[in-house]
Amino acid sequence: MQDLSVNEYLRQYIRTVPDWPAAGVQFRDITPLLQDPKVFRVLIDAFVHRYMDRALRPDVVAGLDARGFILGAVVAYELNVGFVPIRKKGKLPFTTVEETYELEYGSATVELHADAVKPGDRVLLIDDLIATGGTMMAGRRLLERLGATVTEGAAIVDLPELGGSSRLRESGLPLYTLVDFAGH
């Protein structure tokens, strides 16, 4: 890494794909971060070192479908805490609770097993990217409905111009992100 900060180091491994999935969209592809084991270790360590702090340490890590599973499961393993997936509707086999949220065009629903967390659990909610904040907000509502406290939201990438990080912070959710990108 030489003289680069962790954030600058990770930024150089995030690929920007123009006009995908639609014209005018700059897709931020995190898969290069996962392909090199040294880079992946730096990424995971950036989260793990933060959440080893006693004041921030969660009881459970919850990951949002689908790239939040990759990060969340490894971070939970490293912290020696449980991991729970928050899935798109219809993907979990047991009794679930669900939350519907609005998208730019339409809506989406996420769900969580009803026994995934216990009342009082301190939960870190993690995803790869924060755009509008809708998915993270829905995940938070699910966890809180089950009695857990979401202590912080975390993501690799923040797209602040889309307003999600501002909305989440205004709702009272602290956020930790590693790399900001301008634009959509």
From Swiss-Prot:
InterPro entries: Ade_phspho_trans, PRibTrfase_dom, PRTase-like, UPRTase/APRTase. One of its GO terms (molecular function) is adenine binding. GO terms for cellular component: cytoplasm. It comes from the Bacteria. Its EC number is 2.4.2.7. Pathway: Purine metabolism; AMP biosynthesis via salvage pathway; AMP from adenine: step 1/1. It catalyses: AMP + diphosphate = 5-phospho-alpha-D-ribose 1-diphosphate + adenine. CDD domains: PRTases_typeI (cd06223). Keywords: Cytoplasm, Glycosyltransferase, Purine salvage, Transferase. The keyword Ligase does not apply. It is an enzyme of class 2 (transferase). Its main location: cytoplasm. Belongs to the purine/pyrimidine phosphoribosyltransferase family. Homodimer. Catalyzes a salvage reaction resulting in the formation of AMP, that is energically less costly than de novo synthesis. HAMAP family: Aden_phosphoribosyltr (MF_00004). This is Adenine phosphoribosyltransferase. It comes from Paracidovorax citrulli (strain AAC00-1) (Acidovorax citrulli).
